[in-house]
Regions:
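S-adenosyl-L-methionine-dependent nucleic acid methyltransferase catalytic domains
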Residues: 1-198, 205, 209, 220-322
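Short hydrophobic/aromatic beta-strand or adjacent loop that forms the aromatic wall/cage
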Residues: 210-214
C-alpha cells in the first residue's frame, strides 16, 4: 500500500497540493454533466420498493402467461436480433417468470440504473473542468500524458480547453508582440466499445449505450506510448459483480491497458476523480504508483474497501508464488 495515496478530498484542492512537473500520467473520468430525471430513475425507485421485506408480487401467474412482451417466445426467445431456440427459453423461463411476478418486467432489476447521478455530476460545470485542465498541465512533467474520458457531445469543448490550458507567453509576430497560450499537443481520440452494453430505454432507443470517448494529450516533448499500429479502439466489458458500485464505473481491463501503454513501471499516475478507484486498482496490478482523491464520502469509503481487498489478493498471490 506504500505506492497508493488516496484521499477524501475535492479534486482541485488535491491537485493544487501537488508539485509542478511531478506526474507521469493522468488517467481520469470527470463528471459528464449529463444528470437528468427520467423514467429510469422511477424504475430504480420501483425496484427498491419491491425489494423491501414483505412486498407483494405485482403480477399473477395468469398475467405472466398472457403477457404481451412474451409474444411468440414460447417458440423462440429473441436476444438482440438473434432467435434463441426453445431450449434456451426454457432454461431462462423460471428467472423471467420470477422477475415478472415480482417487478412486473421479465428483466427484473437488471437495468435499474439511475440517470440522475446526484450533486457530484449536476453541480459540476465546464468552467470547473477548465480549471482542472490547467492543473493537469501544471502537474504533468514534460512528455507526460493526460487521458480524460468525457461526454461525447462536449468533447470538442474539452479539446479546445486542452489546447489553451498552459501559461501565456509573448512572442514577436511581424512587427508586433502578441500573446500566445501554451497547451497540450498530440491530442487524439480513443474509443471504448462496451462488449456488454446496458440498454437505455430499449423499447424506444434501439441504440444502446455502447461506447465512450476519451482524449489523450501530451505536454510538450514525446509522450510514453508502448504500442504499434494502435487504432485507439478498445473493446472491454462493463465492470460487473460485487466490485461494481459506482454508476459511471469504468472497465478495469481497459484502464490496465491504458496504464500499461502510456506509462512505465514505477511511474506516478494521478486521478482526481477516483470514484470506484479503478485507476488505483489498475496501477496496483501493473506496478505503478497511484495518487488520487474522491470527494464523495460514500464512494471514498467503498473505494478504500476495494483497494484493501485488491491488496489482500495481491499479497496472497505473492505469498503463494514464493
Amino acid at each position: 500500500m506504500n505506492n497508493i495515496i488516496f484521499k477524501h478530498q475535492e479534486g482541485l484542492q488535491f491537485l493544487e497540493d501537488l508539485p509542478s512537473n511531478s506526474v507521469d500520467l493522468i488517467l481520469t473520468d470527470p463528471p459528464y454533466i449529463t444528470s437528468r430525471d427520467s423514467g429510469m430513475d422511477k424504475w430504480v425507485g420501483h425496484v427498491e420498493k419491491q425489494d423491501q421485506e414483505g412486498a407483494r408480487n405485482l403480477k399473477t401467474e395468469e398475467e405472466f402467461k398472457s403477457h404481451k412482451e412474451l409474444g411468440d417466445w414460447h417458440k423462440f426467445f429473441v436476444k438482440g436480433d438473434v432467435p434463441v431456440p426453445l431450449k434456451q427459453w426454457h432454461k431462462d423461463y423460471a428467472k423471467y417468470k420470477k422477475n415478472y411476478l415480482k417487478y412486473g418486467s421479465i428483466y427484473g432489476k437488471r437495468y435499474a440504473v439511475k440517470t440522475n447521478y446526484g450533486d457530484w455530476d449536476s453541480d459540476f460545470t465546464m468552467e470547473t473542468l477548465d480549471q482542472f485542465t490547467k492543473q493537469f498541465y501544471r502537474v504533468l512533467r514534460d512528455g507526460g500524458t493526460a487521458i480524460i474520458f468525457f461526454d461525447l457531445w462536449k468533447i470538442t469543448a474539452l479539446k479546445e480547453m486542452l489546447e489553451t490550458c498552459g501559461p501565456s507567453y509573448r512572442r514577436k509576430q511581424g512587427d508586433e508582440m502578441v500573446e500566445k497560450t501554451r497547451g497540450f499537443k498530440q491530442i487524439r481520440f480513443i474509443e471504448w466499445i462496451k462488449t456488454n452494453p446496458q440498454p437505455i430505454n430499449s423499447h424506444r432507443n434501439y441504440l444502446t449505450n455502447c461506447r465512450e470517448i476519451a482524449l489523450t494529450a501530451v505536454k510538450k516533448g514525446k509522450g510514453t506510448f508502448k504500442s504499434h499500429y494502435d487504432n485507439g479502439i478498445y473493446r472491454y466489458p462493463l465492470q460487473g459483480g460485487k466490485e461494481r458500485f459506482h454508476p459511471t464505473q469504468k472497465s478495469l481491463p481497459l484502464f490496465e491497458a491504458l496504464v500499461a501503454k502510456h506509462s512505465e513501471p514505477g511511474d506516478i499516475i494521478v486521478d482526481p476523480f477516483a470514484g470506484s478507484a479503478t485507476t488505483a486498482i489498475a496501477c496496483m496490478n501493473t506496478g505503478r504508483r497511484f495518487m488520487g482523491c474522491e470527494m464523495s464520502e460514500e464512494y471514498f469509503t467503498k473505494a478504500e474497501g476495494r483497494i484493501q481487498r485488491n491488496q489482500e489478493r495481491l499479497n496472497k498471490e505473492q505469498s503463494s508464488s514464493v
